């Protein structure tokens, strides 16, 4: 499911040549959230952080895609022994942006509270897909979840996306690894700008202006 949109050049038939816009095809029935019949678009790399022994380590994440056929974003990176893929739909992205906005407002007003992150004190909790594996993300769950929290480290507040361990939907008796992805306020603002729907649509429109014209 993770890699279904990759390496499939020619597998979707588009009738939009000459129209100036990408028209929905039969694939729209497969993905109700269909945006355009266009291959995944690589987004600008962003920086996040992992936490190890209470020390933050910067992650430069360049495998970052928008998939117009499903209106999902896919984020690939390594975490420990695992190669991970995190998949977010539009509702989850909007929830992250809303949570990030609240976090930044409270950070600027110095009103954030130093408390252990839990689902109860999360800014937002939502659904996602998580795939993982040693070499490639071969195992996965389409029923994953995440929580957007604040966590203080060395006296400073950071925004953290927490992904609880979840039973895989691709195999039995296998659970996803618990994962956390941290952001400083500056890193968070850039990430949220990347995942805003209007900015993703602008990417699609730019590709369509070159691909679906006579």
Residue ranges and their predicted role:
Residues 2-214:
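Positively charged, low-complexity terminal tracts
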